Amino acid sequence: MEIDVLVEDDGWSALPDAAEIAIAAARAALASLGDEVPEGAEMSITLTDDARIRVLNREWRDKDKPTNVLSFPAAELPEGVVPQPLGDVIVARETVFSEALAEDKTPAHHLAHLVVHGTLHLMGFDHEDDDEAEEMEAAERQILAGLGIDDPYALPAEG
């Protein structure tokens, strides 16, 4: 399994181990799927900024605003062709940091969650309806728990 990380935005230096966090999260997501991951699978993760992800979001989703993560699954190749590209996950720094602050999470944990989320999208998970969302969120919770990260969907405790 090859996972390439490109850090496009220097601001990610505020989280010095961002590339390692992203790789660990993607590996955990893929490991959770076992045999569903094709032999020779590879993917890329791009750590970018809000300006770049806004352009991509506008181009590919007709939404002219930044978002936290985008996933671009690769076209399927015949079985046995190696390498098997899974696709690309792109994460926006400013949105990750602002959401983490608003949700009382660490940026590292939020980044890991978004990479897990994006990687699951590459593997065919979706959240277009309630059943799909429940299945995807359950998978995310399990994967993140294995990384020592609390349930990202839990409401903060009042107090």
From Swiss-Prot:
Cofactor or coenzyme needed: Zn(2+)
Q: Which Pfam families does the record match to this protein?
A: YbeY (PF02130)
User: Would you tell me the protein name for this molecule?
Assistant: Endoribonuclease YbeY
In its UniProt record, a GO molecular function of this protein is: zinc ion binding
Family from the record: Belongs to the endoribonuclease YbeY family.
On whether Hydrolase is a keyword of this UniProt record, the answer is yes
Question: What keywords would UniProt list here?
Answer: Cytoplasm, Endonuclease, Hydrolase, Metal-binding, Nuclease, Ribosome biogenesis, rRNA processing, Zinc
BP-aspect Gene Ontology terms? rRNA processing
Q: What is its EC number?
A: 3.1.-.-
Show the PANTHER family listed in the entry.
ENDORIBONUCLEASE YBEY, CHLOROPLASTIC
Q: Which SUPFAM superfamilies match?
A: Metalloproteases ('zincins'), catalytic domain
Localization: Cytoplasm
